[in-house]
Amino acid sequence: MIAQNGTLEISRSRLMHNVAHMQRRVGMNVKLCATIKADAYGHGVAYIAELLREAGVQWACVYSLEEAMELAQLPWFGILVLSPLVIAEGGELSVDEREALRGQVRVNVTDKESAIRLAKALEVAGFEVPVKVHVQVDAGLTRVGVEPWAVEELVEVIAGLKQLELEGVFAHFSHGDVPKHDTVSEQLKVLHSVADPLRKRYPRLMVHLQNSGGAWHLEDPSLDLVRIGIALYGLQPSTSDPVEGLLPIARITAPILTIHHRPAGTGVGYGHTFVTKRPSRLCSSRARGSSPSARCRYRG
């Protein structure tokens, strides 16, 4: 969504508040990993990244390597790419991909074949310093990740590839925003069942699972990192189990074009998805959206 003739205002102080608020909740020994995929949820990734640096956040995660390229040379971020990097058999890395992986980017690895192909592509590209990888475990989301029983074998493959270095193991909650759901404790146990033995071999292994809701409602000091998403921007991850004390950081302002006075029962906008319940004063502004997402948010 692009606001035409409108202004998107980002509150630095509110973002700082949300960062500090979540950090206090998870404990000062747990690292915050800011989710800044999709242009920082539309807030502007370059500006948000700079504010996060000021706030002391040292980790960020994005969806794809393409998103990571924009941030790869920022020296204060460790950047985790959540989507597995897919390389075809015999495939090579582009120049931009090479530059990103020479920066602070970490890659998600979910199977042996992908690990071997990535290592080969790095070898062909002349990498001398290993790229750090995080292994994603399918703890019950049933979407992306290696099954728990296969983690040990995958780790052995990574250990035998000099172009790769295991840095972390992680999973995603299926119901992280519903703290009392049965799957929350079950999936935490699954992750610990594979990560705890690995910590004996890799003492500095980073283990992470929680999203915004999970970080607030589930305290687990044994986890090293929490991936905070929309809570940083002051948005609620769940309406049924809200995170207390968040402050929305964004505001859109725009000039008013027209003002109408209409009686109760007046339909407004495309499809009349809003109907006045009382005599109302309505205005139209210059902030307009033309994308599909904007159509969902704006009533015409």
Q: Where are the regions a protein language model picked out?
A:
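Nucleotide phosphate-binding/pyrophosphate-handling subdomain across enzymes
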Residues: 16-33
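Active-site anion/phosphate-binding pocket segments in diverse small-molecule metabolic enzymes
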Residues: 1-12, 16, 24, 67, ...
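Active-site-proximal beta-alpha core segment in soluble small-molecule metabolic enzymes
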Residues: 2, 7-9, 30-208
